[in-house]
């Protein structure tokens, strides 16, 4: 059980849910520039396993690292933190 707690957990926004049982999540983080010290925002996309197809585009979700589920999937959906407002 202690090994499970060391897995990476990210919070990000769903940018694609077109695939069956798979979502694409963009995670934005800040990194300090080594020379100038300014914080620079950068983003990275992860594909995550969504067993019940519950996450939709625009939702804020929490994903956790897991064993490789396919050629590109290394994360699974933990929970939908905030649902998107559809206008």
UniProtKB/Swiss-Prot annotation:
Q: Mind giving the lineage of the organism this protein is from?
A: Bacteria, Bacillati, Bacillota, Bacilli, Bacillales
Q: Does the keyword rRNA-binding apply?
A: yes
Cellular component GO terms held in the UniProt record: cytosolic small ribosomal subunit
A biological process from GO: translation
What role does this protein play?
A: One of the primary rRNA binding proteins, it binds specifically to the 5'-end of 16S ribosomal RNA.
Q: Which gene encodes it?
A: rpsQ
**Originating organism:** Bacillus subtilis (strain 168)
Instruction: Quote the protein name from its UniProt record.
Output: Small ribosomal subunit protein uS17
Sorted UniProt keywords: Ribonucleoprotein, Ribosomal protein, RNA-binding, rRNA-binding
**PANTHER family the record matches:** 40S RIBOSOMAL PROTEIN S11 FAMILY MEMBER, SMALL RIBOSOMAL SUBUNIT PROTEIN US17M
The record's family statement is: Belongs to the universal ribosomal protein uS17 family.
Which SUPFAM superfamilies does the protein's record reference? Nucleic acid-binding proteins
The family database entries (CDD domains) matched by this protein are listed as:
Ribosomal_uS17
**How would you summarize the oligomeric state and partners of this protein?**
Part of the 30S ribosomal subunit.
A Pfam cross-reference name = Ribosomal_S17
Keyword Ribonucleoprotein carried by entry: yes
Any one GO MF term held by the record is: rRNA binding
